[in-house]
Regions:
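ABC transporter nucleotide-binding domains
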Residues: 1-187
Length: 187
């Protein structure tokens, strides 16, 4: 298969959590591919490791986790060319290389939108923060316009008013749309 078709290729992902007395493997030999233009649904029983799998790829597992994989390859498309990133070889989960990918290339929409939204900041500012972080030449006004565009695309009513609201002023579904805007704004 042409590597241009595959965005994410995960091979034999294992995640083990270490406590004082034992090691518990939560994710065992997970493999999958995500193809460009396609949707991948990860389903399973509660507690089966879906969230741990995705958190492992994004490197959100914490210090007591051991994440190992044969390969976690992310293929970014930059200026019509494939740019390969081997996430399994990134040693610092919060280092510059992983931070540069998060938000700009890789994003995750959590089940509970309030876990991603800060209650003391306006939702528009929270979406704009990622844009400004990953687009150094962008002005605050340009970021605001991009946020308004995202809100319109995602069906948030009255975006010109809602951009200056706080998370508690949104329904659960609208909060989810704000988090989706955060995830895709840099694409």
């Amino acid at each position: 298969m042409d590597s241009k078709e595959i965005i994410l290729n995960v091979e034999k992902l294992n995640t083990t959590f270490v406590s004082d007395k034992k090691k518990i493997r939560i994710v065992k030999d997970v493999s999958f591919q995500l193809k460009r233009g396609k949707t991948l649904a990860v389903v399973g029983e509660s507690g089966c490791g879906k969230s741990v799998t995705m958190n492992s790829i994004m490197r959100f597992t914490g210090k007591n986790a051991i994440v190992e994989a044969k390969s976690i390859q992310y293929n970014a498309m930059k200026d019509g060319k494939i740019e390969e990133h081997h996430l399994e070889s990134i040693k610092e989960p919060n280092g510059a290389e992983m931070r540069a990918l998060r938000g700009a290339d890789l994003s995750m929409v959590f089940q509970d939108p309030m876990s991603s939204l800060n209650p003391v900041y306006k939702v528009g500012d929270q979406v704009a923060e990622g844009l400004l972080q990953h687009n150094k030449g962008m002005t605050k006004q340009e970021a605001r316009e991009k946020v308004l565009e995202m809100f319109r695309k995602l069906g948030i009513p009255d975006p010109e008013e809602r951009i200056d609201c706080y998370p508690h002023q949104f329904s659960g579904g609208m909060k989810q749309r704000v988090v989706i805007a955060m995830a895709i704004a840099c694409n």
